[in-house]
């Protein structure tokens, strides 16, 4: 509510990094009614021990067929909004997306790969494409998990490096 009232208008452009099954994306649409919502997720089942307990780890909770089905589900969930050009879906990593992106965003929600290096790059890239007085929100701040505290470490790294204002609460973080 605070973000909607003070930062995000109905003509806003919103980016979500890490869409998974689209549940939070749906909430973004319902609560903010943006002009455009861009969803970015590679929908890849990752290899390696580090990903074993993640939502997208091949040896844990997922495999590539499941990820492919999630991608199809998200496209079906937003079929109407895609036709209306209100939602656009990119099946690629956030790095790949940012390399070709020309848009600026009012709000960027980061919920992609939670390992430090990925979150750090997502924040770096997001800051380049954030509109003046825009907001960045990160998922799982100060929460522990398979990601070895990567979200919190990336935020602390940027807090030292950038002139940013950090607001914490409900495990979300705001940059502007």
Language model features by range: what are they?
Residues 2-176:
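S-adenosylmethionine/decaboxylated-SAM
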């Amino acid at each position: 509510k605070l973000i909607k009232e003070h930062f995000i208008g109905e003509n806003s452009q919103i980016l979500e990094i890490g869409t998974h099954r689209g549940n939070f994306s749906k909430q973004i649409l319902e609560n903010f009614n943006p002009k455009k919502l861009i969803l970015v997720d590679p929908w890849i089942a990752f290899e390696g021990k580090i990903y074993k307990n993640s939502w997208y780890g091949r040896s844990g909770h997922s495999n590539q067929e499941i990820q492919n089905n999630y991608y199809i589900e998200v496209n079906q969930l937003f079929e109407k909004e895609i036709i209306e050009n209100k939602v656009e879906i990119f099946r690629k990593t956030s790095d790949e997306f940012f390399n070709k992106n020309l848009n600026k965003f009012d709000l960027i929600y980061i919920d992609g790969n939670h390992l430090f290096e990925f979150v750090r790059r997502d924040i770096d890239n997001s800051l380049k494409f954030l509109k003046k007085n825009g907001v960045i929100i990160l998922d799982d701040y100060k929460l522990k998990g398979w990601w070895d505290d990567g979200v919190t470490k990336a935020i602390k790294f940027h807090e030292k490096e950038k002139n940013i204002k950090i607001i914490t609460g409900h495990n979300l973080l705001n940059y502007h």
